[in-house]
Amino acid sequence: MARFIFVTGGVVSSLGKGITAASLAMLLQAKGFRVSVRKLDPYLNVDPGTMNPHEHGEVYVTDDGAETDLDLGHYERFTGVTACKFDNITTGAIYSKLLKDERLGNYTGITVQVIPHVTNIIKDFIMSNTNGFDFIICEIGGTVGDIEGLPFFEAIRQIGNKLKSANCLFIHLTLLPYVKTVRELKTKPTQHSVKELRAIGISPNILVCRAERNISKSAIDKIALFCNIKPEYVIPAIDQKNIYLVPIAYHNSGLENKVLNFFNINLVPSKLDKWYDIIGKIKDSNSKVKIAIIIKYHKSHDAYKSVIEALNHAGIYYKYKIDLLWINAENLTEENINKKLLNINGILVPGGFGVRATKGKMIAIKYARTNNIPFFGICFGMQLATIEIAQNLIGIKDAVTEEFKIKGTKIIEKINKNSEDVTITIKNTHISKCTYSEEFECDTSTVYSNIHEDSNKESTHRLPIETNFGNISDIKKTMRLGAYPCNLVANTIAATAYQSLEINERHRHRYKFNNEFQNIFEQHGVVFSGFSKNKQIVEIIELPELRWFIGVQFHPEFKSKPFEAHPLFIQFIKAAIEYNKCN
């Protein structure tokens, strides 16, 4: 039977519960255990797919097409285990299922309540799909005391009572703030956080204390005394310069051994060679390469979390520090671009939606193309690159994307159901219309995803929930989600990078390149080096006459890992390093 580990947080949010859960999973893996990591989010959205990136951060897409929390990216990057739709759940998804079942009469007329009905669905999610794993680590989003999180805490309390300590462990992450006037780390917020957790009925077995400096033995003893925890089970979590130093820091504190001791499991040696290799490369990274990221969502860099990490992975590969220059595309003009992109070694335009900030992005793309600066366009960045090429290189001055709903020559068009030759199925029907406060208006329409090899296997899991909040009359409104195969053209930059002619990458887009313009683009030097299996969707474009200019329709950042950097990011950083040396 799998053992369950619940990671909760207190005092403040964004303490690093996801990194802690991912680090522990990796450390247990290093001892030979099989681990699954899951995220339970208390918000009422069905999934993050329609949430403002400024507010939520990036939407992390799994192979099977689930739009999930960015913490699943940490889980994948640290453990190397591919996440799936069964690894993330929200309050919105839970209530969607609950209300649907109630309307269908599945509750046989009884009064439907938070306890036991909501908590039962949460428990079903946690306890399902556990075969083949030694440990299930569940991160509870938010902080203890949040109203929206109470059903989740109640559910894991019930699981703890049922499984007892032999099979269930609670880890609580708190903050020890440093007060400069007294030059002391304060333990009182941690004491109150544990008090709040115990009032719910959960007594933490391990306390992980986040601090900006070393924690004294007297502070640890004080925390242990007032929180009723043995001092050896109070684990310091000192701020690190790089998140990939965190797992080894936890290892040096004995976190995974404390977990195994709690479960009375014999200790075995850890195999951490690849992580020590990463740490060595990070510490040996003395040179820098400067990359400009041309962004729309400038209030939170978490909107581009996987892109940041993928760049860092390539930097680790070459023992280079990645110096990121964040450029708000709305403030970029023809007049100031030379000043803003001074001494840049590479330009990256990541994915996004909507018309806002596109002018600045296209100015940056033109600047990269005309100055022969290494360029990498991802998803929407690739689409804008084709529009820029059409307008300024080919001469199609009115080139536009259908997404903007303005008159012009549609270089980018909406995907239709026949654009993909693999079998597709409706994943979700959570159709809603939402307007971001400072964003674009978006239609969240019928979502399609390809059926993967294991999609036909019977699952006892009740989630993800199929909901219906609208009329799915317009079947052409599609979102191409998840991993799809892509065929590469031999002797191209892409084929050289991948060292293969068949790849599989994750997607999240509604629009694609209009194939009617392929010939005229090729006449002007554009190489189409990647296609979907039936060649209906262009996946990769290149300008081989330039130093390094590539746009991809997919999201390669989702598959990059610190010990296995993505080949396209490796080649992009290589080109940037060479450009830096030449200039």
Swiss-Prot record:
Ligand binding (CTP): 13, 146-148, 186-191, 222
A GO MF label: identical protein binding
One record GO biological process: pyrimidine nucleobase biosynthetic process
Annotated Pfam families: CTP_synth_N, GATase
Residues the entry annotates as binding Mg(2+): 71, 139
Residues that coordinate or bind UTP: 13, 186-191, 222
Matching InterPro entries: Class_I_gatase-like, CTP_synthase, CTP_synthase_N, GATASE, GATase1_CTP_Synthase, P-loop_NTPase, RPE1
Pathway the protein contributes to: Pyrimidine metabolism; CTP biosynthesis via de novo pathway; CTP from UDP: step 2/2
Residue positions binding ATP: 14-19, 71
Reaction catalysed by this enzyme: UTP + L-glutamine + ATP + H2O = CTP + L-glutamate + ADP + phosphate + 2 H(+); L-glutamine + H2O = L-glutamate + NH4(+); UTP + NH4(+) + ATP = CTP + ADP + phosphate + 2 H(+)
Region listing for Amidoligase domain, in residue ranges: 1-265
Residue stretches making up the Glutamine amidotransferase type-1 domain: 291-582
Record entry for activity regulation: Allosterically activated by GTP, when glutamine is the substrate; GTP has no effect on the reaction when ammonia is the substrate. The allosteric effector GTP functions by stabilizing the protein conformation that binds the tetrahedral intermediate(s) formed during glutamine hydrolysis. Inhibited by the product CTP, via allosteric rather than competitive inhibition.
Keywords, ordered alphabetically: ATP-binding, Glutamine amidotransferase, Ligase, Magnesium, Metal-binding, Nucleotide-binding, Pyrimidine biosynthesis
UniProt subunit comment: Homotetramer.
Sequence similarity: Belongs to the CTP synthase family.
Other remarks in the entry: CTPSs have evolved a hybrid strategy for distinguishing between UTP and CTP. The overlapping regions of the product feedback inhibitory and substrate sites recognize a common feature in both compounds, the triphosphate moiety. To differentiate isosteric substrate and product pyrimidine rings, an additional pocket far from the expected kinase/ligase catalytic site, specifically recognizes the cytosine and ribose portions of the product inhibitor.
Summary of the function given for this chain in its UniProt record: Catalyzes the ATP-dependent amination of UTP to CTP with either L-glutamine or ammonia as the source of nitrogen. Regulates intracellular CTP levels through interactions with the four ribonucleotide triphosphates.
PANTHER family: CTP SYNTHASE, CTP SYNTHASE-RELATED
Protein name in the entry: CTP synthase
Species annotation: Rickettsia typhi (strain ATCC VR-144 / Wilmington)
